[in-house]
Amino acid sequence: MTPQKSDACSDPVYTVGDYLLDRLAELGVSEIFGVPGDYNLQFLDHIVAHPTIRWVGSANELNAGYAADGYGRLRGMSAVVTTFGVGELSVTNAIAGSYAEHVPVVHIVGGPTKDAQGTRRALHHSLGDGDFEHFLRISREITCAQANLMPATAGREIDRVLSEVREQKRPGYILLSSDVARFPTEPPAAPLPRYPGGTSPRALSLFTKAAIELIADHQLTVLADLLVHRLQAVKELEALLAADVVPHATLMWGKSLLDESSPNFLGIYAGAASAERVRAAIEGAPVLVTAGVVFTNMVSGFFSQRIDPARTIDIGQYQSSVADQVFAPLEMSAALQALATILTGRGISSPPVVPPPAEPPPAMPARDEPLTQQMVWDRVCSALTPGNVVLADQGTSFYGMADHRLPQGVTFIGQPLWGSIGYTLPAAVGAAVAHPDRRTVLLIGDGAAQLTVQELGTFSREGLSPVIVVVNNDGYTVERAIHGETAPYNDIVSWNWTELPSALGVTNHLAFRAQTYGQLDDALTVAAARRDRMVLVEVVLPRLEIPRLLGQLVGSMAPQ
């Protein structure tokens, strides 16, 4: 869409709001998500008038925050705009999730004018006590940098917050009073400066020496996780894997970080819930490199990992360790490059990875056979093609797909640490806006979708054509598996899912209800052929059936 200059922005004066937008554009932001409110309306005029940034409105602030998160995971930076008080508190859950999962999101809050705040009167959207920094203080717990912009220092403060967001890969908060947004200023004089390299030559040298001694002539095994992606060290990791025959795996959090079609890819490591071949290879490795790994309860089989520190090289954001000896400051990319150099320089080749025993292909289900979890995820996975962006909500969708190998070039997004159900539907909007050339595939349960379903209309308005699989298992199946199998609090109202897109303003779509394998197969075949429109497939599953991996996790679960 081509931005149209608004009447409110016909004044040629360059403002603080323009400065903020130009810095965001410099960092790769071409869309901003949010919800209008009277304290941010004039700033929104500047967004609409900006030559390279486009406004994408959401149905509510929570969904806008989720959309910004999905966008930020693919673009490396994103922004969401809300109004003071009521708007910013509504997006807090999404911002906290971005903080937990290392997603760079800039939260811009339109606030009352400085003069109005100075009166300490009971303004709308405030708590009525004359204190207008309550919510700024709340934001300090879930953002890496905050600023309450003042005219004289606005540019410097914007640069500080954006630099921290870029460096730490976590959200930042900017309180932009409506009069400060309009205040005249000068455009940026130079690109946003980058922090100097954070690697000490001495730390790198000592790390390399210790790694050489530990590795010796052993074959290296690698376990990688999402921080490699967030810290933009994927190329360095791939170079390490190409330096020798290196068996490797990821956690569920880092699924699709590496090419899962590679013969050296072992699978997903989840502690005691892992497939035995994967568990044995990771836990029995002579030397294991853990790159960007964060063990959380839901991706480690409730902390059942058995990793021997004496045989482990751990690569973190700013420090690394060899057999528990810490070396810092040492950036992840530098440590990975050092390991690749060690492997290429030692002049030996490790043996090939032994492939798993060949298993006969599963029998094709009969077309009239009722759907099961295994059938659904097998068929969904077979429908994926390179370039797809797959978002799986935290439930049977996430754990059903975690067990399946993805085609090369597929990006997988979940939220296993924060685990806010409903997240993926608006996040899919953000992902699709970030890369409209890549088809988005959304996998979500009925209970989760009921929380954020309004954004179906946003897909349509933005001209996006996702494939949406809604798992209708009649309520909160994961919760039923954990506790309260027949409890009324795990029940939800049954919706007519195939009629919902029309009710929410979707004008170009197809909708199917699949109860049998044949119906699912037909629906996904049509979805693959019709890339010009949204395709929603409701799949009906038994209310108590869960995927294998989720069953193992639930079985090992203790009260947390």
Swiss-Prot record:
Keywords on record: Allosteric enzyme, Decarboxylase, Lyase, Magnesium, Metal-binding, Thiamine pyrophosphate
Residues bound to thiamine diphosphate: 61
A Pfam match: TPP_enzyme_M
One MF annotation (Gene Ontology) recorded for this entry: thiamine pyrophosphate binding
E.C. numbers: 4.1.1.-
Cofactors that this protein relies on: a metal cation; thiamine diphosphate
Domain of life from the UniProt record: Bacteria
A GO biological-process term: aromatic amino acid family catabolic process to alcohol via Ehrlich pathway
Binding-site positions, Mg(2+): 446, 473, 475
CC terms in the record's Gene Ontology section: cytosol
Cofactor note: Binds 1 metal ion per subunit.
Location of region: Thiamine pyrophosphate binding: 396-478
PANTHER family noted in UniProt: PYRUVATE DECARBOXYLASE (PTHR43452), PYRUVATE DECARBOXYLASE ISOZYME 1-RELATED (PTHR43452:SF30)
Function of the molecule: Decarboxylates branched-chain and aromatic alpha-keto acids to aldehydes.
Family statement: Belongs to the TPP enzyme family.
Record-given protein name: Alpha-keto-acid decarboxylase
Species of provenance: Mycobacterium tuberculosis (strain CDC 1551 / Oshkosh)
Lineage: Bacteria, Bacillati, Actinomycetota, Actinomycetes, Mycobacteriales
Gene that produces this protein: kdc
